[in-house]
């Protein structure tokens, strides 16, 4: 079955508000084997919303509408769904009584306009809202000659998630054909989306019963594999077979076959070896340390880090010889090597990581352009240095450098 998500609210058509509900709903629908075919954002105009609902009913099996269930004049979702379906609205006395009782229990006075939240579409099942005042509604109807499922959900994310998890998921499980879903998430580092797809497309195109999607973000590729079968064992067998073939093809760049982040993998390998890592960051400004310390239990393997932006701190905290900086410059392979070795020794760690570069937008030259980054990984036996030239703005360069640095450590640990 296919679905459409309609997000209601003029604020989401401005630069100041994002529709995060659709991401959550997509994940939930996919877990049930439902494909999201369309996502639509509609402002608070009755004609536009009615048109969007009618269009959705023509082209999908399930319509999930978020927002527009509040008490104000521009909260029009109930009215628009009723108009699109040719049904009436009835104000539910029990809902009104419950609304006032809840307000009294909280010693809150509510205005009469809140009563419009008790308007129920003919034939709808009421979805209780334990986290807010606006009830949702569920409709399982025949529209034209086809069965359609519609759900009206509140806009605030905490209210929507609670209502969907506790009430819509069981209703959907009963309404949908009984299918088992198997999913796998594979991740690769420092490979372009087009390059990755060129390598694996000949493989996944042979598996027409598996939905394969590629998501790319700043040096990270996520491959989502999803298969629906009558029995879970069948679905898992197919997904695992495809995953195995992709793992073999991407062996040089793949770092996770179960959806872990790169920092989780680095910390896992460190802990398995009983080793520790220390980091000296210049252009990344603490991004690497932040990613590592965001993982619970990272203190077992992460010794510590230093942000050594100035030349003085490179010497003070990482022991870099000032003459080395004077001879080669702060952005050089020699200084990256000294950072990695110095921080490893000063933190008594097994591995040291040093990063220095030019994140821009200024500071570059013909010999050392913006985007030039040197990364080094040091052990007591050997120090490896890598030169990379990234493109993009400051944010992109810094995050790519952090991703490259973590992947460099991962490769040394394998």
From Swiss-Prot:
The cross-references to SUPFAM superfamilies, in alphabetical order and at most eight, read: CinA-like, Molybdenum cofactor biosynthesis proteins
Q: Which Pfam families match?
A: CinA, MoCF_biosynth
Q: Tell me which Gene3D superfamilies the record gives.
A: CinA-like, MoaB/Mog-like domain
The record's listing under SMART domains reads: MoCF_biosynth
Q: Identify its protein family.
A: Belongs to the CinA family.
The protein, known as:
CinA-like protein
